[in-house]
Amino acid sequence: LLFQTYAYIGSRSIYSVVSILNRDIAKLKFVSGVEVTEEDYKLSGTEFQFPDLHLTPEQLGNRQKWIIESILRIWIQQPQVAFLILEYLIEFGILNPQYLIRKALDPDSNLIINNVSCMESINRVLSTCAVGESSKEVILLLFNLIVENLNYTLGKIGVENPETEEVKIITEFSEEDKNDTELMAKIDLQWLFYEYRGLLKTYLRKFNLQHSDYSKEIEDIFESIQNKPVKSDVMRLIKELTY
């Protein structure tokens, strides 16, 4: 409710949200479960200091997820506003970017594929994180989740030989077939698989990680791609980008 109140202020001006976040940063960090620093107390202009909650990783994660869900819920009709507010929460250190990335790549919603505002927001977050201290953690998480979603979607498509068979999208069907819910669901999954494959290659090109100090860890993640045609395609792209 607290974060929804701050998010609602965004209906007047997004800059009003930024101003209030800056003013109440100590309180908001405490509620979100992250560490409150001396600088945060100075910015908030308060001498009162919050107690250490000693949260477990699970408890911290739950708080971070509640923040994301509460803001997306209140701005369900204007996702661009919701994601912009979430970006500001990350900028102020109130929200860990990894939780937003997990939400964007949740296979139950596939927001990064289905919502343009989400993809644009994640791209901005990734660009910022890529030059920060948490770049390795964020990038590894990103690729790991994409590969997990590829494998998960592959399993749901029902390909006869999922490891060796190339996933093709059914593009020709009759008017009568349009009423076949099972067929239409399968085509949706084929497109989803295709979209995640494209997303993986896009981010590979974007970050050019072949010369990073964790390129081996990236390749290990790609080795877990279950569909060999996709794995071969990705590995070939890595070699092309290396030279």
Q: Model-derived features: where do they sit?
A:
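Long alpha-helical repeat solenoid scaffolds
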Residues: 1-243
